[in-house]
Curated annotation (Swiss-Prot):
Pfam families: TAL_FSA. Keywords: Cytoplasm, Pentose shunt, Schiff base, Transferase. Belongs to the transaldolase family. Type 3B subfamily. It comes from Desulfatibacillum aliphaticivorans. It is found in: Cytoplasm. GO terms for molecular function: aldehyde-lyase activity; transaldolase activity. InterPro entries: Aldolase_TIM, TAL/FSA, Transaldolase_3B, Transaldolase_3B/F6P_aldolase, Transaldolase_AS, TSA/FSA_arc/bac. The gene is tal. Pathway: Carbohydrate degradation; pentose phosphate pathway; D-glyceraldehyde 3-phosphate and beta-D-fructose 6-phosphate from D-ribose 5-phosphate and D-xylulose 5-phosphate (non-oxidative stage): step 2/3. Its EC number is 2.2.1.2. This is Probable transaldolase.
């Protein structure tokens, strides 16, 4: 399973990358805005740090504008993936961009039919939002299971990119279901490495070592 980090903060990206936790990065307008720096500067810094897919999202909602914006974003770096919302105009843009060899990550996906449509349109990645679905009906992981089944049934090249990850259990369940990628906030990445027994065991080892020096 590939791990992407869901952030636009370069310090978080560098720290996670130093631990081998970053195969790619996803951003969105909200994450970019939090950094208080020019959009293109942030994206270029991320591309310089991570040699993998970097999702940058369009802000247009009309197909022609999304296509134009997507081409401009793709010109920033070879690793840019264009993030497109799951709307009818978005599927037109997805088809057009993917036909020109520009990879697309279809975002804001909440149903298996949306996921199927996005794959048919040529998306390289499709991002189901498991946390937001769980907020409504606790069905986030059911969607992942359905998507993996559908994509396997028809040998789609589209990758399931699990998004809106709220806790380590989301990552574990997605991995067990065979999802290709999880995009994970930095705080959740850190939680994935922790366990009370690890802390207890380390404390005991260190205490024994200190005793041995006396």
């Amino acid at each position: 399973m590939k791990f992407f980090i869901d952030t636009a903060n370069i310090d978080e990206i560098k720290e996670a990358n130093s631990m081998g936790m970053v195969d790619g990065v996803t951003t969105n307008p909200s994450l970019i805005a939090k950094e208080g720096r020019p959009f293109e500067d942030i994206i270029k810094d991320i591309c310089a740090e991570v040699d993998g897919p970097i999702s940058a999202e369009v802000i247009s909602t009309e197909a022609k504008s999304m296509i134009e914006e997507g081409k401009k974003l793709a010109a920033i770096h070879k690793n840019i993936v264009i993030k497109i919302p799951m709307i009818p105009d978005g599927m037109i843009a997805t088809r057009a961009l993917s036909s020109e060899g520009i990879p697309v990550n279809v975002t804001l996906v909440f149903s298996p039919l949306q996921a199927l449509v996005a794959a048919k349109a040529g998306a390289a990645f499709v991002s189901p939002f498991v946390g937001r679905l769980d907020d409504l009906a606790n069905e986030g992981m059911l969607l992942i299971e359905q998507m993996v089944t559908i994509y396997n049934n028809y040998a789609f090249d589209t990758e399931v990119l699990v998004a809106s990850v709220r806790n380590p259990l989301h990552v574990l369940e997605a991995a067990m279901m065979g999802a290709d990628v999880a995009t994970i906030p930095f705080g959740v990445i850190k939680k994935m490495m922790g366990h009370p027994l690890t802390d207890k065991g380390l404390a005991a080892f260190l205490a024994d070592y200190e005793k041995s020096k006396k």
